[in-house]
């Protein structure tokens, strides 16, 4: 009788221990079942299978300053001045002016690392907020091609920019292409990135423009990228870079390849 009671107590003890262990394990089991594994998350599109690599850090600390040019309209800009490998300010190898597309501002070039990269490579980099974008107010005074040309001229003259390389993506072609037509001799180089407005230039006008040009567009940009490429290759002094796997804003999809092509082009100009 005593042995029977002892055995029963042992069994009850084991059952109680198993119950306690199961209770303790249930929260982690429930949590694990609710959260998909990294592999499952990648299949579900909850996270990128391969995150884009960050831009390589510059070995030199670059300061990007901001300014506001008075006038109608006032123009906000960002500037990175060229420095040597020790971080000392130097005379620029070239001056570069960067415009932007409709969904972007001058801050895009700062966040992408383009301004710092140019400055650490010896170039003065100026990025402009076009009227109605970023910190530059809109204005009725820039509704014609000539008024937009005058705006760029005012910006360049006020900041002492002479013979710059002009970079123009997408929407900013409304400013850059008329300027190129009228003042191509004032540009040391031109970098169109699938700009609008390329159909408004005649074959003869293209032929007369001798400015060295780097045409950049994304492989997947079959609309404006392909259309602008077809027109821009009429420029007699051009080079083409097509960024594989990149969309309309190809510099955002492939920043390293974009920067490499840009620096290579600039190195052949100075």
From Swiss-Prot:
TM region positions: 9-29
Active-site residue numbers: 170 (charge relay system), 221 (charge relay system), 248 (charge relay system)
EC class (word): hydrolase
UniProt key word Cytoplasm: yes
Lipid bilayer topology: Single-pass type II membrane protein
InterPro entries: AB_hydrolase_1 (IPR000073), AB_hydrolase_fold (IPR029058)
Molecular function terms from GO: hydrolase activity
Pfam families: Abhydrolase_6 (PF12697)
Localization annotation: Cytoplasm; Membrane
UniProt KW keywords: Cytoplasm, Glycoprotein, Hydrolase, Membrane, Signal-anchor, Transmembrane, Transmembrane helix
Major location category of this protein: cytoplasm
Gene Ontology CC terms: cytoplasm; membrane
Residue positions with a glycan: 61, 237
Catalytic activity, EC: 3.-.-.-
Protein family (similarity comment): Belongs to the AB hydrolase superfamily. ABHD14 family.
PANTHER family in UniProt: PROTEIN ABHD14A, PROTEIN ABHD14B-LIKE
Function (record text): Possible role in granule neuron development.
UniProt name for this protein: Protein ABHD14A
Organism of origin: Danio rerio (Zebrafish)
Lineage per the UniProt record: Eukaryota, Metazoa, Chordata, Craniata, Vertebrata
């Amino acid at each position: 009788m005593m042995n029977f009671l002892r055995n029963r107590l042992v069994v009850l003890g084991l059952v109680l221990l198993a119950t306690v262990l199961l209770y303790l394990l249930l929260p982690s089991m429930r949590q694990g079942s609710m959260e998909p594994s990294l592999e499952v998350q990648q299949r579900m599109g909850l996270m990128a299978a391969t995150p884009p690599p960050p831009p390589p850090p510059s070995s030199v600390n670059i300061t990007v300053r901001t300014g506001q040019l008075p006038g109608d309209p006032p123009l906000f800009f960002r500037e990175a001045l060229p420095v040597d490998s020790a971080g000392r300010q130097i005379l620029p190898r070239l001056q570069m002016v960067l415009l932007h597309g409709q969904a972007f501002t001058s801050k895009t070039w700062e966040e992408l690392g383009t301004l710092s990269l140019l400055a650490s490579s010896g170039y003065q980099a100026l990025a402009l907020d076009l009227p109605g974008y970023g910190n530059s107010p809109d204005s009725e005074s820039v509704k014609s091609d000539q008024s937009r040309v005058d705006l760029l001229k005012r910006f360049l003259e006020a900041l002492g920019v002479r013979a710059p390389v002009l970079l123009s993506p997408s929407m900013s072609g409304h400013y850059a292409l008329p300027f190129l037509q009228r003042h191509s001799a004032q540009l040391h180089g031109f970098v169109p990135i699938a700009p609008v407005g390329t159909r408004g230039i005649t074959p003869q006008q293209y032929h007369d423009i001798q400015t060295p040009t780097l045409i950049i567009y994304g492989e997947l940009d079959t609309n404006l990228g392909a259309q602008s490429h077809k027109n821009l290759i009429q420029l007699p002094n051009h080079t083409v870079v097509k960024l594989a796997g990149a969309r309309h804003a190809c510099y955002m999809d492939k920043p390293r390849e974009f920067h490499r092509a840009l620096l290579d082009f600039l190195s052949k100009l100075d």
